Amino acid sequence: MKCPYCSAPDSKVVNSRPSDDGASIRRRRECLNCARRFTTYERAQLEPLMVVKRSGPREAFNPDKLLRGLTLATEKRPVDADALRAFAYGFEDDVQASEIHSEEIGKRAMTFLRPLDDVAYIRFASVYRDFDSLERFIEEIRGLKDQS
């Protein structure tokens, strides 16, 4: 493993243990050149979850993109940022398929937001469902109100 401090090509493993989440191995390493220590994480390389876009093309799932959408919807709302992060970064692990349609990601995000905050839910729905009129927006709010 290349040293991040001096770029020497060799290091030795000083300590190795499972990470807190159990999904990776945490290794403490020591550079054989400069003797500085650093931490690396080893994780299994899985096939990426592919997202089928509305227009047809496929792209690898990006949890940061989902997190950005959730963060925008919850901006200035009393929603725990750690909950958003956990949902976005745990999303790929929860999907038991190699492909998912972008519409399904939106549905699952709305299901996640619904019990957390009504305003965030409506904000996300307005983008996800692509409201084209005020009437459509009002319909969604009425539906939300009826479910409460």
Curated annotation (Swiss-Prot):
<dbReference type="InterPro" id="IPR005144">
    <property type="entry name" value="ATP-cone_dom"/>
</dbReference>
<keyword id="KW-0479">Metal-binding</keyword>
<dbReference type="InterPro" id="IPR003796">
    <property type="entry name" value="RNR_NrdR-like"/>
</dbReference>
<keyword id="KW-0805">Transcription regulation</keyword>
<dbReference type="GO" id="GO:0008270">
    <property type="term" value="F:zinc ion binding"/>
</dbReference>
<keyword id="KW-0067">ATP-binding</keyword>
<dbReference type="GO" id="GO:0045892">
    <property type="term" value="P:negative regulation of DNA-templated transcription"/>
</dbReference>
<feature type="region of interest" description="Disordered">
    <location>
        <begin position="1"/>
        <end position="22"/>
    </location>
</feature>
<dbReference type="GO" id="GO:0005524">
    <property type="term" value="F:ATP binding"/>
</dbReference>
<dbReference type="Pfam" id="PF22811">
    <property type="entry name" value="Zn_ribbon_NrdR"/>
</dbReference>
<keyword id="KW-0862">Zinc</keyword>
<comment type="similarity">
    <text>Belongs to the NrdR family.</text>
</comment>
<comment type="function">
    <text>Negatively regulates transcription of bacterial ribonucleotide reductase nrd genes and operons by binding to NrdR-boxes.</text>
</comment>
<dbReference type="InterPro" id="IPR055173">
    <property type="entry name" value="NrdR-like_N"/>
</dbReference>
<feature type="zinc finger region">
    <location>
        <begin position="3"/>
        <end position="34"/>
    </location>
</feature>
<dbReference type="Pfam" id="PF03477">
    <property type="entry name" value="ATP-cone"/>
</dbReference>
<keyword id="KW-0678">Repressor</keyword>
<dbReference type="GO" id="GO:0003677">
    <property type="term" value="F:DNA binding"/>
</dbReference>
<keyword id="KW-0238">DNA-binding</keyword>
<feature type="domain" description="ATP-cone">
    <location>
        <begin position="49"/>
        <end position="136"/>
    </location>
</feature>
<keyword id="KW-0547">Nucleotide-binding</keyword>
<keyword id="KW-0804">Transcription</keyword>
<protein>
    <recommendedName>
        <fullName>Transcriptional repressor NrdR</fullName>
    </recommendedName>
</protein>
<keyword id="KW-0863">Zinc-finger</keyword>
